[in-house]
Swiss-Prot record:
It catalyses: IMP + L-aspartate + GTP = N(6)-(1,2-dicarboxyethyl)-AMP + GDP + phosphate + 2 H(+). Keywords: Cytoplasm, GTP-binding, Ligase, Magnesium, Metal-binding, Nucleotide-binding, Purine biosynthesis. It is an enzyme of class 6 (ligase). Plays an important role in the de novo pathway of purine nucleotide biosynthesis. Catalyzes the first committed step in the biosynthesis of AMP from IMP. Its cofactor is Mg(2+). CDD domains: AdSS. Pfam families: Adenylsucc_synt. Substrate binds at residues 300-306. This is Adenylosuccinate synthetase. It comes from Geobacter metallireducens (strain ATCC 53774 / DSM 7210 / GS-15). Transmembrane segments: none annotated.
Length: 430
């Protein structure tokens, strides 16, 4: 028996969806434990592209149960839309294959309105929010004002909580943000309709997961975003509002730490970032544009072009430490096919002195200079390779060097977007 957590080891968009899709073959349950529809997983199966924002990637596999844990914040409209799209494609024929924790917090219209209005007023201090209400929903969760899914299903409780919250939110919208107030009747009617649709998916998912573990079933925990976007360990305040690290898999599902056996970090063979915040290896030249265009580095959720840079070993080494990674899956190695020379950031300097770890102080981090090591490119197409030993020697040397720098074994190498374009070195479920 093995239960595996998959986390992003950089700033998100590392290719977790594909890796989760591959590992799902070996799992019984696939569990989402944090975030909301601010993350997009792009999967290519038999040439068909599917983008999921809330529902775990495992839904594309028959016989698997997908669970959305209590650490997620749920937009009912988006969730229902994803269900309908999957059913149109012939997926999710059995509704019992998808469960949602009764304790998830619900994204309300005022959360989205506040999110967008705040970002619009922040000028050059923008965080880079997707505007989907994720942060304000987590604010209400921590402030003990949130509306949970179990509340939405109880007409009396939902009406009371909505009325109380809307009084405060409309004050904020009108008096502080200069926006129009929202209508209680409109929200109540719409969300009561959502409740009727959602009811059949709701469950005590913590209990179900723990029973499955006791029965010897294998669980795969699917993280969203990345380690450097973690609200505690990331480049605060340019972070998301949830715990993206491996520890979030426990708090976000109700499964204890001793039932986690493997933690796999996902890292690109280079690095990208969306939105504002420090990025020491960012490339603003032709190399950066080549990475962006070749790698298709545009957000699955927003369509925004991603910032691109050379592989940063400091970032991934940090992710290895704070997550306790047992392995790293390296994605998009093929994007580097045409480079004559490839750089690796092996460390930073600040004011001319070496930096031991990622600075928590943003003012320091923003002034860190990367220390580069150069390696020759392999200048050949590797997408047809299926065994590590069949990669060009220079590609193998690159992977081995990254492994040395991050002090963690690389257990998988992705060389294209397709499920079959993968080299598995070690299976964490084996």
């Amino acid at each position: 028996m093995a239960n595996v957590v998959v986390v992003g080891a950089q700033w998100g968009d590392e290719g977790k969806g594909k890796v989760v899709d591959i590992y799902t073959e070996h799992a019984d349950d696939v569990v989402r434990y944090q975030g909301g529809n601010n993350a997009g997983h792009t999967l290519v199966v038999n040439g068909e592209k599917t983008v999921l924002h809330l529902i775990p990637s495992g839904i594309l596999h028959k016989g698997k149960r997908c669970i959305i844990g209590n650490g997620v914040v749920l937009d009912p409209e988006v969730f229902i839309m994803e269900i309908n799209r999957l059913k149109e494609k012939g997926r999710l024929q059995d509704d019992s294959a998808l469960l949602v924790s009764e304790s998830v917090h619900i994204i309300m219209p005022y959360h989205k309105q506040i999110d967008l209005a705040r970002e619009a007023k922040s000028g050059d201090k923008k965080i880079g929010t997707t505007g989907r209400g994720i942060g304000p929903t987590y604010e209400d969760k921590i402030g003990r004002r949130g509306i949970r899914l179990m509340d939405l299903l109880d007409p009396e409780i939902f009406a009371r909580k909505l009325r109380e919250n809307l009084e405060e939110k409309n004050f904020i919208l009108e008096k502080l943000l200069g926006e129009k107030p929202l209508s209680f009747d409109e929200i109540h009617k719409t969300y009561s309709g959502y409740a009727d649709i959602l009811r059949k998916y709701v469950a005590n998912t913590s209990l179900i997961l723990c029973k499955d573990i006791a029965a010897g079933k294998k669980l795969l925990f699917e993280g969203a975003q990345g380690t450097l976007l973690d609200v505690d360990h990331g480049t605060y305040p340019f972070v998301t509002s949830s715990s993206t690290c491996a520890g979030g898999a426990c708090t976000g599902t109700g499964v204890g730490p001793r039932d986690i056996h493997e933690i796999i970090g996902i890292s690109k063979a280079y690095v990208t970032r969306v939105g504002s915040g420090p990025f020491p290896t960012e490339l603003l030249d032709a190399d950066g544009e080549q990475l962006r265009q070749t790698g298709g580095e545009f957000g699955a959720t927003t369509g925004r072009p991603r910032r691109c840079g050379w592989f940063d070993a400091m970032v991934v080494r940090f992710a290895v430490r704070v997550n306790g990674l047992t392995g790293v899956a390296l994605t998009k190695l093929d994007v580097l096919n045409d480079f004559d020379t490839i750089k690796i950031c092996t460390g930073y300097t600040y004011e001319g002195k070496p930096v031991e770890d990622l600075p928590a102080n943003l003012a320091v981090f923003e002034k860190c200079q990367p220390v580069y090591e150069e390696m020759p490119g392999w200048k050949s197409d590797i997408r047809g390779v299926r065994r590590f030993e069949d990669l060009p020697e220079k590609a193998r040397l690159y992977v081995h060097r990254l492994q040395e720098l991050i002090s963690c074994p690389i257990v998988l190498v992705s060389i294209g977007p397709g499920r079959d374009e993968t080299i598995t070195i070690r299976n964490p479920f084996a």
